[in-house]
């Protein structure tokens, strides 16, 4: 099940799956206390724009499960080194390092997107969105992208 993944990748993947399951469990436990209509749309300032039935929260949770599942599946694809698409030539023998780095990057991306979706679910139920908190996972993801490219360049250049 976790073949080809290191401990850090396994932990991050399990955290993402646990966040999805906990979000679903929290919604199911609090279902009777949720308002009949929840916020389904926010504007750029974080104010609600429209309301919908509370069952629409399951669409958001379903998308969260789909994204987390896709990232988890990508982590489990066996590495085929000749198909790596990098802007630099990868020296012979360094492909496993690049694959491990890429899987780390996928884990960080998955965690950022999952945390953002959990917060969005909470904001829809609560009815208020804190805009800077919504962007925080994407800022972390941008920093991870820069880290990934710098680290990959160092590995390729030796």
Residue ranges of model-derived segments:
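Alpha-helical transmembrane segments and their helix-start/interface "positive-inside/aromatic belt" motifs
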Residues: 5-19, 58-60
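Select subsegments of transmembrane alpha-helices in polytopic membrane proteins
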Residues: 12-17, 70-74, 101-113
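Alpha-helical transmembrane segments of multipass membrane proteins
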Residues: 19, 23, 63, 67-71, ...
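Active-site and channel-lining beta-strand-loop segments
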Residues: 27-59
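Membrane-water interface of transmembrane alpha-helices
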Residues: 29-34, 69-88, 148-156
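Interfacial helix-start motif at the membrane-water boundary
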Residues: 47-67, 100-106
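Short membrane-interface loop/juxtamembrane segments of multi-pass integral membrane proteins
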Residues: 87-102
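Alpha-helical transmembrane segments of multi-pass integral membrane proteins
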Residues: 112-158
């Amino acid at each position: 099940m976790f073949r080809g993944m290191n401990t850090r990748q396994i932990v991050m993947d399990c955290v993402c799956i646990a966040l999805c399951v906990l979000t679903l469990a929290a919604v199911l436990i609090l279902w009777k206390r949720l308002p009949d209509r929840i916020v389904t749309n926010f504007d750029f300032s974080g104010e609600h724009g429209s309301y919908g039935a509370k069952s629409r929260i399951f669409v958001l949770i379903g998308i969260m499960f789909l994204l987390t599942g896709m990232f988890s599946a990508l982590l489990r694809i066996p590495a085929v080194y000749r198909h790596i698409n990098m802007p630099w030539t990868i020296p012979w023998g360094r492909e496993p390092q690049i694959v491990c780095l890429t899987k780390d990057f996928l884990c960080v991306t998955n965690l950022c997107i999952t945390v953002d979706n959990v917060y969005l679910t909470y904001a829809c139920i609560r009815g208020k969105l804190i805009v800077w908190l919504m962007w925080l996972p994407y800022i972390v993801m941008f920093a991870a992208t820069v880290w990934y490219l710098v680290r990959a360049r160092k590995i390729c250049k030796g």
